[in-house]
């Protein structure tokens, strides 16, 4: 009899759990405005590269490129269905455009033109990636789709949305070229001074998504300095040299080579989750090399060029195998990395950092290029 009661209790608990999960999923879907207008768009070039983008969150859902033997693989982590992006309990920002301010703002507040603005705190005491409903969780308008070649999306972030001042009109354009370059252009205007720091949050695994860790990938960062953080991952304001530290990627090395060192910054980030100060040889607004990644098994190489002054290198420290991606593949600890071109975290509160303030009458322009090739 006790066994029957336990079985019934377990069955009841399971039913309640399923009902709760179903309610969460339906609630999450119900919160998405214009759900029926969400579509998937394909860019494809003459060199065999394919990129798929959805207008939900301006998310890059897949990037398919050949290896040294011509074998194709999807190297972008993500999901098969848009519902999975919407319903994910853990929000990893797979493939999304994040903003109005990508990265963190300390204590969820900043002062601009004598007025203090309070933002939604969604990362402990701090504000992260634009808040609870940032650009990654809204349906973007499709302005133009040139079949197979380019996709231009727009979104109007209204005054006080997630606490930010000003109506911000944002455009993001994805263009795939025949030399296997994915060009991402950002444009923004505002009717009131506001911080803007928009970036792309794709997780890469050049072996193929779901194919183990990225610790063997060899990374070069064109940066002799980085911005160390406190325990809340807010920059301290210093910009020390990387020489002699695990953060020195000025020459290519395996991501996993120094990640286990006893270093306070690695402890705070649970690995690499920091902003590097890019060496900018040209004028502001000019494209310069930011990073190069080589995966030895496949021979795939990715280069990133950007007009931005910084780049956030995050190596999937919070992935733990619970998230199931495309075709049900688990994404293991450090199973993907992000290279987010950006202005520095918490710039609105740190005046010696490059400014992120956009004013009426100005246009914010930024470009990042992800270029793929094969090495023998």
Where are these regions (language model features)?
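N-terminal secretory signal peptides that target proteins for export/translocation
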Residues: 1-12
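Intrinsically disordered, low-complexity regions enriched for glutamine and histidine
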Residues: 11-14, 29, 199
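An exposed, glycine/acidic-rich loop-and-rim segment of catalytic or binding clefts
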Residues: 31-376
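Bacterial N-terminal signal peptides
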Residues: 14-26
């Amino acid at each position: 009899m006790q066994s029957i009661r336990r079985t019934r209790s377990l069955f009841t608990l399971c039913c309640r759990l399923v009902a709760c999960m179903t309610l969460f999923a339906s609630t999450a879907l119900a919160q998405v405005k214009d759900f029926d207008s969400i579509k998937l768009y394909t860019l494809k070039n003459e060199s065999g590269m394919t990129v798929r983008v959805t207008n939900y969150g301006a998310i890059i859902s897949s990037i398919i490129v050949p290896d040294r033997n011509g074998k194709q693989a999807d190297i972008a982590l993500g999901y098969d269905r848009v519902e999975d992006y919407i319903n994910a309990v853990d929000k990893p920002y797979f493939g999304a455009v994040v903003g109005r301010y990508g990265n963190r703002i300390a204590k969820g507040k900043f002062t601009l033109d004598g007025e203090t603005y309070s933002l939604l705190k969604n990362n402990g005491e701090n504000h992260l990636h634009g808040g609870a409903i940032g650009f990654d969780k809204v349906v973007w308008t499709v302005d133009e789709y040139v079949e197979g070649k380019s996709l231009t999306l727009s979104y109007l972030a209204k005054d006080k949305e997630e606490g930010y001042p000003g109506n911000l009109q944002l455009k993001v354009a994805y263009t795939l070229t025949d030399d296997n370059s994915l060009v991402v252009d950002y444009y923004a205007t505002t009717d009131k001074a506001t911080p803007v720091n928009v970036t792309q949050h794709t997780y890469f695994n050049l072996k193929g998504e779901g194919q183990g860790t990225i610790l063997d990938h060899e990374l070069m960062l064109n940066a002799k300095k980085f911005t160390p953080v406190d325990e809340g991952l807010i920059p301290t304001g210093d910009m020390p040299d990387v020489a002699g530290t695990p953060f020195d990627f000025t020459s290519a090395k395996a991501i996993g080579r120094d990640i286990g060192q006893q270093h306070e910054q690695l402890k705070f980030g649970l690995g690499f989750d920091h902003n590097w100060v890019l060496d900018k040889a040209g004028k502001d607004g000019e494209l310069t090399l930011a990073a190069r990644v080589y995966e030895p098994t496949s021979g795939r190489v990715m280069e990133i060029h950007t007009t931005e002054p910084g780049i956030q290198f995050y190596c999937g420290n919070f992935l733990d195998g619970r998230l199931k991606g495309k075709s049900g593949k688990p994404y293991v600890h450090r199973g993907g990395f992000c290279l987010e071109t950006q202005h520095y975290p918490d710039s609105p509160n740190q005046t010696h950092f490059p400014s992120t303030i956009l004013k009426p009458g100005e246009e914010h322009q930024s470009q990042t290029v992800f270029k793929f090739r094969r090495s023998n």
